[in-house]
């Protein structure tokens, strides 16, 4: 999402007449590479049978046979390199700041996603395979974004040291306080802060215009320059905006199949995971807002996550999330993570294909 302010793209511009549900068994599907078993996923037998699902397929005249046009493939997208750094040193150190009240299960879910980025053992399609697209981006020396990501430190600010309403400036004060209290190192070369606010914390423009954003710290406020990202937990404030498709806006009514079931049963946090993925991909490829982005205005760049917002699988785009998977419990996902976790994470722009791509592509 664009930095410093992430513009929310409402990716559900479609009529309810085209809002229909298709499920196809993998036994009859030619794309058997997505078949998962109990042993490979380490999940209960009740969730062993996986099906492919696309709850918002395009009209039949624009079917999956022409899916490339729904995956953002375009020679008109001018994503350019502006000579700035990318996070290429290994590992990329993430310093997580938990602001507000966070439960252990919610923290565990987000940690598992972050740890899945470097976990090559997860079955395909996996989070680590998704991150390979981010690692295609290079700096002027030819160094790629690192494939290794590490949670290098954590700090819990459960007492809301800067109140329960934050702005883009006070978020830097939160970072400064956390850096001092947790004794985070000044990690210029390969570090970043990830500020996560709980469901009862409001942020300037949250729900109205942003679900998350990234920028860099100001020396005058934090003491040095370092990239950071902020993402809010929308579960009680605006799940229909920031946790879509696990929650639907009211104007959609009841003409379609309804919201999708989140892979870990947590609408707000499962939705948050995709926003975190979006922001991380943009931080590493454009940490100081002078590396990879489209458009001429660095104060409102279109970045590698923005170009694919709302796209989760093949056949998607133009208002459709694409073909994703569903287990027997009805939970939807498009990639596997560490320890049998499953996630639904948006695709990102592939500079080689000049299209959005993800590990669950069936083309």
UniProtKB/Swiss-Prot annotation:
Leader peptide range in chain numbering: 1-25
Glycosylation sites noted in the Swiss-Prot or TrEMBL record: 144
Alphabetized Pfam families for the sequence: Phi_1
Keyword annotations from UniProtKB, A to Z: Apoplast, Glycoprotein, Secreted, Signal
Source species, domain of life: Eukaryota
Recorded GO CC terms: apoplast
Induction per the UniProt record: By brassinolide.
Record keyword Transmembrane helix present: no
Keyword Glycoprotein attached: yes
Localization per record: Secreted; Secreted, Extracellular space; Secreted, Extracellular space, Apoplast
Matching InterPro entries: EXORDIUM-like
Family: Belongs to the EXORDIUM family.
Function: May play a role in a brassinosteroid-dependent regulation of growth and development.
PANTHER family registered for this protein in UniProt: PROTEIN EXORDIUM-LIKE 5
Name of the protein described by the UniProt record: Protein EXORDIUM-like 5
Gene: EXL5
């Amino acid at each position: 999402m664009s930095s410093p302010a992430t513009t929310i793209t409402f990716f559900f511009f479609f009529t309810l007449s085209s809002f229909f549900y298709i499920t196809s068994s993998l036994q009859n599907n030619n794309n058997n590479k997505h078949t998962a078993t109990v042993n490979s996923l380490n999940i209960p037998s009740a969730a062993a049978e996986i099906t492919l699902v696309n709850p918002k397929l395009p009209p039949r005249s624009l079917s999956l046979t022409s899916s490339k046009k729904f995956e953002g493939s375009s020679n008109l997208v001018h994503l350019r390199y502006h000579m700035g750094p990318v996070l290429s040193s290994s590992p990329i150190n993430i310093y997580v700041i938990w602001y507000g009240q966070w439960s252990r299960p919610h923290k565990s879910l987000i940690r598992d996603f972050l740890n899945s980025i470097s976990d090559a053992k997860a079955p395909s399609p996996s989070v680590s395979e998704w991150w390979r697209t981010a690692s295609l981006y290079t700096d002027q020396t030819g160094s790629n974004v690192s494939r290794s990501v590490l949670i290098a430190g954590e700090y819990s600010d459960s007492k809301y040291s800067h109140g329960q309403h934050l702005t883009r400036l006070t978020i830097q004060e939160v970072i400064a306080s956390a850096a001092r209290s947790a004794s985070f190192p000044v990690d210029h070369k390969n570090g970043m802060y990830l500020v996560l606010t709980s469901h009862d914390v409001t942020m300037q423009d949250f729900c109205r215009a942003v679900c998350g954003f990234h920028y860099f710290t100001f020396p005058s406020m934090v003491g040095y320059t370092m990239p950071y990202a902020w993402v809010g937990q929308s579960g009680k404030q605006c799940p229909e905006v920031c946790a879509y498709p696990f929650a639907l806006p009211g104007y959609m009514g009841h003409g379609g199949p309804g919201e999708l079931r989140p892979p870990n049963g947590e609408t707000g946090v499962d939705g948050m995971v995709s926003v975190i993925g979006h922001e991380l991909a943009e931080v590493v490829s454009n940490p100081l807002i002078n590396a990879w982005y489209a458009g001429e205005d660095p104060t409102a760049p279109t970045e590698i996550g923005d170009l694919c917002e709302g796209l989760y699988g093949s056949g998607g785009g133009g208002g459709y999330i694409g073909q994703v998977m569903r287990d027997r419990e009805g939970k939807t996902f498009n990639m596997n993570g560490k320890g049998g976790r499953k996630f639904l994470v948006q695709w990102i722009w592939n500079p080689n294909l000049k299209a959005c791509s993800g590990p669950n592509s069936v083309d």
